[in-house]
From Swiss-Prot:
The lineage of its organism: Bacteria, Pseudomonadati, Pseudomonadota, Betaproteobacteria, Burkholderiales. The gene is hisC1. GO terms for biological process: L-histidine biosynthetic process. The keyword Transferase applies. It catalyses: L-histidinol phosphate + 2-oxoglutarate = 3-(imidazol-4-yl)-2-oxopropyl phosphate + L-glutamate. InterPro entries: Aminotransferase_I/II_large (IPR004839), HisP_aminotrans (IPR005861), HistidinolP_aminotransfase (IPR050106), PyrdxlP-dep_Trfase (IPR015424), PyrdxlP-dep_Trfase_major (IPR015421), PyrdxlP-dep_Trfase_small (IPR015422). One of its GO terms (molecular function) is pyridoxal phosphate binding. This is Histidinol-phosphate aminotransferase 1.
């Protein structure tokens, strides 16, 4: 009798599924979500819009009106195309699949977004991780050396980086782009609503650079919509491996509606940036903590005992992310999503109970 073990790849059999904890009843500060719902009148208007969606029809594979609205709203440079994905994760998978020649490699700073490595390995690409410096800034010399040695097909630069919050220096990125002429440079701006800089306006300057974004961190994580901006030469090829109906009709309608109300989402992002500053100051004042600078909607914090702090917060019904086992540079670190003022107050109260002194 045939079993899964007879058919499925050995590396897949050795894997575990990506863990997503049940957050029911918790203050949920583990996944970098916007804590704010839509204002009630806007939510009601969206509901009316969604009630008109033809659920019996397949979605438009390339929704022209939505793409045009997205280009205008996000300031996509002339000469660039836009490719939609079911979240950034699908775009990463499409790029991995399209670039998966025998012996090809993917390179990224580590610690970084886990999907770069996971997607590469699923496409049977070799992943090369280049450690950050001890202060979690980019080790440019190590990156340049690794690029010269490995000649990767894809180089990912998260801008800012998750889970560290680091916003790499533009001059350093320019050096990497110049050195990696044989590579595709993917600048991942998932957390751009909380950063002060963007590479999107420069996407047309370089023939080997694409910029990836998502609407998740802006406040729309539930609709799973990511987009890639870059040269038509690249996006035409990636479009060939895109599932034909990958963006469902409800996601398309929601995005089309809310792109007309970006002022609401931008105001929420501004509130979260202010909360980030306040929260960082208050956490840094707690005994035994080190708060790393962050340009995202989260804080990376080193504590005396990450596992103990994580468990103590769970007892107080506050869920954060213990990242201390992800990489040696993250030893005794937890990642705290910036929540609403009330959520942050509960987090601070729980941290005061969890930290000795």
């Amino acid at each position: 009798m045939t079993t899964p073990q007879d058919i499925i790849r050995r590396d897949v059999l050795a894997m575990t599924s990506y863990p997503v904890p049940d957050a029911s009843g918790f203050v949920k500060l583990d996944a970098m979500e916007n804590p704010y719902p839509l204002p009630e009148p806007l939510a009601a208007a969206l509901g009316e819009r969604l009630a008109q969606v033809a659920l019996n029809r397949y979605p438009a594979p390339r929704p022209a009106a939505l793409l045009d609205k997205l280009r205008h709203a996000m300031g996509v440079p002339a000469g660039c195309e836009v490719l939609l994905g079911n979240g950034s994760d699908e775009i990463i998978s499409m790029m991995s699949m399209a670039c998966a020649k025998p012996g090809a490699k993917v390179l990224a700073p580590v610690p970084g977004f886990v999907m770069y490595e996971l997607s590469a390995k699923l496409a049977q690409l070799e992943f090369v991780g280049v450690p950050l410096k001890a202060d979690l800034t980019l080790d440019v010399d190590a990156m340049l050396a690794a690029i010269a040695e490995h000649r990767p097909a894809i180089v990912y630069l998260a801008y800012p980086n998750n889970p560290t919050g680091t916003l790499y220096d533009d001059a350093d990125i320019e050096r990497i782009v110049a050195a990696a002429r044989h590579s595709l440079i993917v600048i991942d701006e998932a957390y751009q609503p909380f950063a002060v800089r963007s590479w999107l306006p420069r996407a047309a300057e370089f023939d080997n650079v694409v910029v990836m974004r998502t609407v998740s961190k802006l406040g729309l994580a539930g609709i799973r919509l990511g987009y890639l901006v870059g040269s038509p030469a690249w996006l035409t090829e990636f479009d060939k491996v895109r599932p034909p109906y990958n963006i469902n009709v409800l996601t398309q309608a929601t995005a089309d509606f809310l792109l007309d109300h970006l002022d609401v989402l931008d105001a929420q992002a501004a509130d979260l940036r202010a909360e980030r500053t306040r929260l960082a100051q208050e956490v840094a004042a707690l005994p035994g903590t080190t708060v790393f600078p962050s340009a995202g909607n989260f804080l990376l914090v080193r504590v005396p005992d990450a596992a103990a702090v994580f468990d103590a917060l769970l007892t107080e019904r506050v869920l954060v992310k213990n990242v201390s086992k992800m990489h040696p540079l993250l030893a005794e670190c937890v990642r705290l999503t910036v929540g609403s003022p009330d959520e942050n107050a509960r987090l601070l109260a729980a941290l005061k109970l969890a930290l000795p002194g």
